[in-house]
């Protein structure tokens, strides 16, 4: 969905989810700055190179990392889930920016939602699958 930002610049939106993290991403023409919940992206992702690379991967695969500012609102989960959700949200926003981007992003796997989530704990068990020790006699 295309919307105008406060500065009358066009913003492209995308939503990403992973585990229990939900992320809303806005791409605005700019210089490549990533802001997550009002903090610089590097600081929010604790300067972890894998988280940062993961979040910026769709932009880098298209060579647009210095053309758009990424504004992120992230809720829930931990840093791993949020970084993966940002990746999906950025990829979806890039598809909205130009439908031609869809094919290369799909081939790289950036548009695939990872369905893995924490399995619920079952009654009678200690965890989701761990059973109490069984004694035959």
Curated annotation (Swiss-Prot):
It comes from Acaryochloris marina (strain MBIC 11017). Belongs to the universal ribosomal protein uS9 family. One of its GO terms (cellular component) is cytosolic small ribosomal subunit. This is Small ribosomal subunit protein uS9. The lineage of its organism: Bacteria, Bacillati, Cyanobacteriota, Cyanophyceae, Acaryochloridales. One of its GO terms (biological process) is translation. Residues 118-137 are annotated as: Disordered. SUPFAM superfamilies: Ribosomal protein S5 domain 2-like (SSF54211). InterPro entries: Ribosomal_Su5_D2-typ_SF (IPR020568), Ribosomal_uS9 (IPR000754), Ribosomal_uS9_bac/plastid (IPR023035), Ribosomal_uS9_CS (IPR020574), Ribsml_uS5_D2-typ_fold_subgr (IPR014721). GO terms for molecular function: RNA binding; structural constituent of ribosome. Keywords: Ribonucleoprotein, Ribosomal protein.
